Curated annotation (Swiss-Prot):
This is Ribosomal RNA small subunit methyltransferase J. Belongs to the methyltransferase superfamily. RsmJ family. It is found in: Cytoplasm. Keywords: Cytoplasm, Methyltransferase, rRNA processing, S-adenosyl-L-methionine, Transferase. S-adenosyl-L-methionine binds at E112, R113, D164. Its EC number is 2.1.1.242. It comes from the Bacteria. PANTHER family: RIBOSOMAL RNA SMALL SUBUNIT METHYLTRANSFERASE J. HAMAP family: 16SrRNA_methyltr_J. InterPro entries: 16SrRNA_methylTrfase_J, SAM-dependent_MTases_sf.
Length: 243
């Protein structure tokens, strides 16, 4: 499964909504597709053969437990999210790391260049209630991060840029979560990760944080690293950082 080629729907009442999405993403409308974006009455999901339906979720109920793990998380120690700090998640994926950062009060802008993943993220944002919106400041732009950064004016530079590149596919095992398997197959390797890191260093106020496999050599020598069990967070400081 490398591409999603269709939009499906659970019942005929959802056909019009599914057709609009299919037109928007230039996909076919196919109610019987076994691999597709799948519209249900509750939410937009990703339907993949041999997997249960997958979807993005930004409800505070879901993420309050992860916040409860506190600042011991490598992600939090590396990014140091606090109320009002602006974080650009340049490779949003399922939006899970962005959601965790937002629970600590950060203002997080997600970028996602894959149109299918961007559609799933947008749907998750649209399902939030007022309490979710107040507690987690999340927004989304469906864009390639490199193009977005080139268009950014200096006054709009984020405090932190967070990058979680899709690395070369790991060995298939039960240890690789289904969401990661899907991203690996759908998106593939981010071969422009090095370019993105270098560009980010000239478009950020405080630091660039890169999530990378623990046993894999960093793309660039970091200024600092925070180790986890299977991943680490490499930290890069811009030359003229004031922080």
């Amino acid at each position: 499964m490398n591409r999603i080629k269709a939009v499906g729907y659970e019942n005929n009442e959802l056909k019009e909504k599914a057709q609009l999405l299919a037109d928007q993403l230039n996909l076919q409308l196919d109610q019987n597709a076994d691999t597709c974006l799948f519209v249900t009455p509750e939410k937009l999901t990703l339907k993949i053969r041999n997997f249960s339906l997958m979807f993005a979720d930004f409800s505070t109920m879901t993420w309050s437990k992860r916040r409860g793990e506190g600042k011991k998380q490598g992600l939090i120690r590396a990014c140091k999210p606090t109320k009002g700090i602006k974080i650009l998640d340049a490779t949003a994926g399922w939006g899970k790391d962005a959601a965790i950062l937002a629970t600590f009060g950060a203002d997080v802008l997600m970028l996602e260049r894959h149109p299918v993943m961007a559609a799933l993220l947008a749907d998750a944002l649209s399902r939030r209630n007022e309490a979710d919106i107040q507690k987690m400041c999340l927004s989304l732009i469906a864009s390639d991060a490199i193009s977005f950064l080139h268009s950014l004016q200096e006054k709009d530079y984020p405090d932190i840029i967070y990058i979680d590149p899709m690395h070369p596919e790991r060995n298939k095992s039960a240890l690789v979560k289904k969401e990661m398997q899907v991203l690996q197959q759908l998106i593939g390797t981010d071969y422009d990760a090095m370019e993105l890191i270098k560009l980010s260093l000239s478009h950020v106020k405080s630091r660039v944080v890169v999530k990378w496999p623990q046993k894999v050599k960093p793309l660039l020598p970091p200024d600092a690293s925070i180790d986890g069990k299977t991943v680490r967070f490499d930290i890069y400081m811009p030359q003229f950082s004031s922080n």
